[in-house]
Amino acid sequence: MPLIEQMWRISAVSISTRYVLIASMDVTPEAESLFNEVYDTEHVPNLLQVPGVHSVTRMKGEPARFAIAGAVRELPAPSPIYTAIYEIDHPQVLESPEWAEAVERGRWPSEVRPHTSNRQHLLFKVR
């Protein structure tokens, strides 16, 4: 099987929705532990209850070395450093009353959000 076909099969199986929201941000070092605790135990579970949200995958960037164009190059850690990928049915999920309520629930808005910066939100349609 050609590599491109293999990649398509992996992609088609890995993402189960037609849209993904990518939310990225930095967090102050003193709030990083609280950020991770609240994101994992409150924020993600709250958003997974929103109709049209199917999964959330969290990640933290790291520096790396990689070979390209005949040389090994340094890849710095990304900025922002934290990213979450939300698989959603359609863009209207993001403006629904359920989404609006979920993002303001728990400790996230009052105890965590003030410690975040460099926030980026990107919406992609899966092809």
Q: Where on the chain are the PLM-derived regions?
A:
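Macromolecular interaction modules
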Residues: 2-127
